């Protein structure tokens, strides 16, 4: 759980501090690593945010990373490559090549895999791709996690340094990221999001006793309107008085299923991402083929 929390914290850092067109620095990369391994023992690193000072090997790979003395120069070269002003049509290819090169350098003692996926997410933002729409339920870098065996196989192809191997790696990454970005775009369609994900998530939650009929009715109205206040719910809850509706809203707010649009507001929106409804959302996403069924 700590490891997952660290990744979430690092992604918040990326979203807050990196915008399209901005340079990615070595400090930024080292900061991602420091946040990723913070407070971890077995999955941590003795020197968070610092390049390794010893040799390393890579699990499931025959590639032997360069001696530690060369890491700073290789990382400087990589950062210059990522920030170089090339035609936009090459952006996704640069994402693919930067991901492989980082793995090839293996700049840190531990946590390289987690850090490079965060770096890849950062590059997509830097190059202007819309990857935040889905609230991070989907992450375009999932292409590297869905089939780990194929991921390492394609990395090995690129590790040869041959043009054919690098082409195969780029094709693998571009195809995967394209598929994931299409999923994100699909979730940007309000009708699809409501009918295929959010409403089914409510039914799933109601069927498992997470919410009752009244709570489901309130949440459905919020999904259709995006926000509601007490008067908006009188039509769908004709048997309840205003005070009773206010009480129901208060219970949902206490559970994190509703949240005011701003502090002190009496206008509310649904809270899916950090509540008991999240399991229903995951179930709906899995049913629609958005996430793998492990």
Show the residue positions of the predicted features.
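FIC/Doc superfamily catalytic core
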Residues: 1-294
